[in-house]
A protein has these predicted regions:
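Glycine-rich, basic loop-to-helix element that forms the pyrophosphate-binding segment
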Residues: 330-347
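A charged, aromatic-enriched C-terminal amphipathic alpha-helix characteristic of glycosyltransferases
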Residues: 225-255
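N-proximal low-complexity "stem/linker" segments adjacent to membrane-targeting elements
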Residues: 249-285
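Conserved donor NDP-sugar-binding/catalytic core segment of glycosyltransferases
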Residues: 364-395
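Short, acidic, metal-binding catalytic loop of nucleotide-sugar glycosyltransferases
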Residues: 284-293
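C-terminal catalytic/acceptor-binding lobe
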Residues: 232, 427-497
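Short aromatic/hydrophobic "clamp" motif used to bind/position activated sugar donors
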Residues: 352
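Nucleotide-sugar donor-binding catalytic core of glycosyltransferases
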Residues: 1-3, 42-179, 187-196
Length: 497
């Protein structure tokens, strides 16, 4: 400690650069680290309740709350559904002495481990000390500790994790594991805390009794739609707000007064159509997107009436997050591939999202698709698992279940293509009107590209009763044979999150 304090004293006297310190162990080690924190020009703390204490005990220029976050390069949902899964897990340590509040919580929060025959990874298993031994009823479920890399794999292997809170009153301090699990697509059931409720309300269910904990776990394990929706909400919340890039932006803003780089890149929706009967669906699909920065480029068949085009432009330009609308006109002889390439060349966005005119794209579709590039390492993303509505039979069928969050997918639906513009300039569409999507996929793979099949939410494919409506004229019974029936038209909301 003395050597560190002497080094900080010398650094403060010899350098004009700000000293930034982060105490990630607040509030437990507030007093322990105070002699060090007094040298900081800017202090960041995991517990907002400690801000006044730092202001009273240091001369820091600023004191700011900064919660934990997730490194989505390590903790993410990639390929989670392609691994054999177990049901329920708790990872951590037990203290038979001290930590009375934590011990009380564990007394009821671990009951689901017994009821659902889960697993406990004991962080203190290497210490043969009775102080750290789990109570007798939980010991049959205890497994040895694993290192962090192994734990990140386990995050994806279990359907549900349990969490307890050593700190319950802080509005910002909670286990880092909660962020990492949600980033991995794994729902968490937790004992109550102010931080959990402030940051993950509606995402992390909390329990105050053993029965509540068992009921919350039971619903996640046995209600498939509830599990998937909870998983997707957690991924989105962490990817948008709780990555270390977000925390880095906060540090730059506080220390250097630099505006954060949190503005998301411009995304260009390209849509080629000759069917003006889908006018209202096109407007709704695009205008309801929650992604904050959108450009729209249409490639229209020259049969579209001028007044309809003018109305379309006018309505979309009134949407606050749509920054530019551009219309390109083409003769009937132009191929679909040619029109798409022209729209992409005109695009100013970093990302290109290909929309079809007759499918449904729900509000968080574009936001979630672009977030996948934060962690997937993909060159092109889309959906291989998605619901299709068969108009003739009013059936909703989930196509290709089990291919969600799949990196290395050989296929994604053309109507769901999202890629950086640079990739689609490297692998442009062929001059054809059928099979142009599959051709891009094949050439992408041949060029060493990585294709990511994302979640199955917020997009529903439309199959008309008359197959002549589609360029791919597969009969409806093909979809029913190769997919899984999941409802009817009234069940669309099950696939929107």
């Amino acid at each position: 400690m003395r050597a560190l304090l002497e080094m900080l004293e010398e650094l403060r006297e010899s350098s004009n650069k700000p000293i930034v310190m982060i105490n990630k162990e607040d509030p437990l080690h507030f007093d322990k680290f105070m002699p060090i924190m007094k040298f900081a020009d800017h202090i960041f703390t995991t517990d907002e309740d400690m801000i006044d204490g730092y202001r009273q005990n240091t001369d820091a220029l600023s004191v700011t709350a900064m919660p934990f976050a997730a490194n989505m390069a390590l903790t993410n949902p990639v390929n989670r559904v392609r691994e054999q899964t177990e049901d329920l897990c708790f990872a951590g340590s037990y203290y038979s002495e001290g930590h009375d509040e934590r011990k009380r919580q564990m007394g009821y929060m671990l009951e689901p481990i017994v009821e659902f025959k889960g697993a406990i990874f004991d962080r203190m298993s290497v210490h043969d000390n009775p102080r750290y031994h789990f109570p007798e009823r939980f010991r049959p479920f205890v497994r040895p500790a694993v290192d962090f890399r192994q734990m990140t794999q386990l995050y994806r292997r279990f359907k549900v994790f349990l969490n307890v809170n050593t700190i319950v009153t802080s509005p910002t301090m909670m286990s880092r594991r909660v962020y990492e699990l949600l980033a991995s697509g794994t729902p968490v059931v937790s004992s109550p805390s102010r931080a959990i409720e402030a940051h993950f309300d509606g995402i992390v269910p909390t329990a105050s009794t053993a029965r509540q904990a068992c009921d919350a776990v039971d619903r996640l394990l046995n209600d498939d739609r509830h599990w998937w929706k909870t998983s997707q909400k957690g991924i989105r919340e962490v990817a948008l707000k709780h990555q270390y890039a977000n925390r880095g932006n906060l540090v730059r803003k506080v220390v250097f007064d630099q505006d954060s780089a949190e503005t998301q890149p411009l995304a260009t929706i390209v849509l080629s159509t000759k069917r003006s009967q889908f006018f209202e669906r096109i407007v709704k699909n695009i205008s309801q997107q929650t992604y904050p920065r959108i450009e729209v480029i249409f490639a229209f068949h020259d049969s579209w009436p001028e007044e309809r085009i003018a109305e379309l432009e006018n309505r979309l330009k009134q949407v606050s997050n749509i920054q530019r609308v551009r219309v390109l006109r083409f003769p009937g002889t132009a191929s679909l591939g040619t029109k798409l390439n022209a729209a992409i060349a005109e695009a100013k966005g970093e990302f290109i999202a290909k929309f079809d005119d007759d499918d449904w794209y729900f509000p968080n579709y574009l936001q979630d698709m672009i977030l996948t590039f934060d962690f997937s390492g993909a060159d092109l993303a889309g959906k291989w698992s998605f619901p299709v509505w068969l108009e003739g039979s009013d059936r909703l069928v989930l196509r290709n279940p089990g291919n969600e969050h799949r990196l290395g997918s050989p296929y994604v639906a053309g109507a769901t293509f999202v890629a950086r513009k640079s990739w689609l300039q490297k692998i442009p569409f062929a001059d054809r009107s059928q099979g142009e999507d599959t051709d891009v996929l094949k050439r992408s793979l041949a060029a060493g590209g990585k294709i990511y099949s994302a979640d199955h939410f917020n997009f529903i494919n439309y199959r008309a009763a008359d197959v002549r409506h589609h360029t791919w004229r597969a009969e409806s019974d093909l979809f029913e044979r190769t997919g899984r029936a999941v409802g009817r038209r009234d069940d669309f909301q099950d696939w929107v999150v």
